[in-house]
Curated annotation (Swiss-Prot):
Gene3D superfamilies reported for this sequence: 3.30.70.60
Protein name stated in the entry: Elongation factor 1-beta
CDD domains linked: EF1B
Highest taxon above the source species: Archaea
Origin species: Thermoplasma acidophilum (strain ATCC 25905 / DSM 1728 / JCM 9062 / NBRC 15155 / AMRC-C165)
Gene this chain is encoded by: ef1b
Length: 88
């Protein structure tokens, strides 16, 4: 099986959330589950930000769900959505 490039959008639970802290926790939580291709803070407007995360996972059933579940367990994370999935 090949690998898949997945783009995730991680929204904080509230506007006061510490984005840098969430980024650090994401890195720790997903270590060993996937590799990080890119992680950026994106401004929505009016001080609101989200994390755009590109990861590479194995093309196996349930891999993306495992990563999403690991991220959603982080305090301060509100919503996670998968924006793009590409076979590489």
């Amino acid at each position: 099986m090949g690998d898949v490039l997945v783009t995730l959008k991680i929204l904080p639970k509230d506007t006061d959330a510490d984005i840098k802290s969430i980024e650090d926790q994401v890195k720790r939580n997903i270590e060993g589950l996937c590799s990080i291709n890119r992680m950026d803070e994106v401004d929505i407007g009016f001080g609101l930000k989200y994390i755009k995360l590109e990861i590479i996972v194995q093309d196996k059933e349930g891999e993306i769900d495992r990563v999403e579940n690991s991220i959603s367990s982080i305090e301060g994370v509100g919503e996670i959505s998968t924006e793009n999935v590409s076979l590489i």
